[in-house]
A protein has these predicted regions:
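Beta-strand signatures of extracellular beta-sandwich domains
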Residues: 15-19, 88-90
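Short amphipathic, basic-aromatic surface patches that mediate peripheral association
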Residues: 1-8
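Exoplasmic/lumenal beta-rich domain surfaces
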Residues: 26, 30-72
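A short, structured loop/turn motif at beta-sheet edges
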Residues: 20-25, 77-85, 110
Length: 131
């Protein structure tokens, strides 16, 4: 679950990415924001996305407004746990600040059980394992 802070303006675009142990993007897991024309406002992710042939295979959906929450199901291979991988949540709002690491969660058993606080438009992220 992604809980947004209350803020003025358009809905936030949020990207959820798998970051490898070297700190590089490995895979886009989810995109919250429907219009491709705004993807370039998520600058670091957009660089990765254009280098990786531009074809987006992640789940996409609506942007998230201030104070709203969004639920997403993402698949993470258990082999990535406790190996130095992270989940990165990037956020951007039209004509406002871009947050490259609004939330970053280490892929450890302990971290996945805790609430992670955001630094920008995201108030917090809470993950739940689906059996």
């Amino acid at each position: 679950m992604i809980q947004m802070n209350s803020y003025e303006g358009e809905g936030a675009y949020v990207i959820i990415s798998l970051i490898n142990p070297k700190g590089a993007y490995e895979k886009t897991l989810s995109v919250l924001g429907p219009d491709k024309q705004w993807y370039n406002t998520l600058k670091e992710w957009h660089k990765f996305q254009t280098k990786s042939n531009g074809k987006l295979s992640a789940i996409t959906g609506a942007s998230v407004g201030g104070g709203d929450r969004a639920m997403r199901t993402i698949e993470i291979d258990d082999a990535k746990l406790n190996k130095g991988y992270k989940l990165r949540f990037e956020s951007a709002v039209e004509e406002q600040k871009y947050h490259v690491t609004d939330v970053e969660i280490p892929l450890t058993v302990e971290s996945l059980a805790e609430r992670a606080n955001g630094k920008g438009y995201i108030r917090f992220v809470k993950l739940s394992k689906v059996q």
